[in-house]
Regions:
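Conserved ABC ATPase "signature" region
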Residues: 123, 127, 134-152
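ABC transporter nucleotide-binding domain
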Residues: 199-296
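Hydrophobic anchor residue at the start of the ABC signature
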Residues: 170
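Catalytic Walker B motif of ABC-type/P-loop ATPase nucleotide-binding domains
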Residues: 181-185
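Conserved catalytic motifs of ABC-family nucleotide-binding domains
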Residues: 177
Length: 334
């Protein structure tokens, strides 16, 4: 049982989020003439806790259950089984109270009204949350200054770049001054400079005392931002620790990084059959390909690399210390 404590003049639970054995099953109808229903478990058994003031990461491959978990915690989906509390409120019984106290920031360009200005967008969402008119306009100004868009506040959102729209998403998610913010891949599709600015804003929010649950596909981002990270695979949490703690899963390995040209999918598949290869990832671009091979052998495997890639052009081979991404790959592929 989570005890209550005093904070900022009111009683609250010690944990901002408590998820206990959450499960979500969807009914999927298949067939054209003979239609049959199939039960699909999107989230099978998810349990974790998030402290107040923590930036907690939830990472996993596509279809692992990240978004479904977020939707249950933000009251957009009802769990099939299990329980969860958000800011001390039950996600099934206290829907309105939770929605008043949380913010949701999505990646991408959806969720904004592009034919009106940033100010008009924020006024609209402030009114939906019931923000008092006496503080609304001042808060909008503060938020637009925080995201660096005050000088473009009266321009139509359709004239904004993708990065500017993402910053406006952040302001929208903060308009009700939420205690807890859910960020679903907030830097997806952004160029490196804008993504870096977005990560800086996220850090500043934590410094201001906000609690954040972040989903991301970028392991370096989770490593940089998160106090703890949960890795979800096939609807279940397979690991939960600090970034440095997760790296211990691959402390006995090295990463052989091969930069080359002409590397094929068939050659990548060959590496997966090598006995001492724990995981393989490949970025097969048009002009340059990067192959990352996780193995306990390190430099001892170079001769095998050269043999398998004898028909490809190899520019460079490096032996690197494992990163959070390497730990992630090992956990989600094994």
């Amino acid at each position: 049982m989570t005890r209550k404590r005093r904070g900022r003049g009111e009683s609250r639970l010690e944990k901002a989020i408590v998820a206990g054995h959450l499960c979500k099953v969807f009914s999927v109808t298949k067939g054209t003439f003979r239609r049959t229903k199939t039960q699909v478990g999107a989230v099978k058994d998810v349990s974790f806790e998030v402290d107040y003031g923590e930036l907690f990461g939830l990472v996993g491959p596509n279809g692992a259950g990240k978004t479904t978990t977020i939707k249950m915690l933000t009251t957009m989906l009802i769990p099939t089984s299990g329980k969860a509390t958000v800011l001390g409120y039950d996600v099934q019984r206290d829907v309105t109270k939770i929605r008043q106290k949380i913010g949701i920031i999505l990646g991408g360009e959806r969720g904004l009204y592009t034919r009106v200005s940033a100010i008009d967008n924020l006024r609209y969402f402030a009114d939906l949350y019931g923000v008092s008119s006496s503080i609304r306009d001042n808060r909008i100004k503060e938020l637009l200054q925080f995201i660096g868009l005050w000088d473009r506040a009266r321009d139509r959102v359709e004239t904004y770049s993708k990065g500017m729209k993402q910053r406006l998403h952040i302001a929208r998610g903060l308009i009700n001054n939420p205690e807890l913010i859910f960020m679903d891949e907030p830097t997806i599709g952004l160029d490196p400079e804008i993504a870096r600015e977005t990560r800086k804003m996220i850090k500043e929010l934590v410094e201001k005392g906000k609690t954040i649950l972040l989903t991301t596909h970028y392991m370096f981002e989770a490593d940089e931002l998160c106090k703890r990270v949960a890795i979800i695979r096939n609807g279940e949490i397979v690991a939960l620790d600090t970034p440095s703690g997760l790296k211990k899963y691959v402390i006995d390995t090295r990463v052989v990084e091969v930069e080359g040209f002409g590397i094929t999918d068939k050659e990548v598949a060959e590496f997966k059959e090598v006995s001492d290869v724990l995981s393989v990832s490949a970025d097969l671009g048009e002009n340059k390909q990067i192959l990352k091979i996780q193995t306990p052998k390190g430099s001892e495997i170079i001769s095998e690399v050269q043999e398998i890639l004898k028909n490809s052009r190899i520019y460079d081979i490096k032996i690197k210390e494992p990163t959070l991404e390497d730990a992630y790959l090992r956990l989600v592929t094994n």
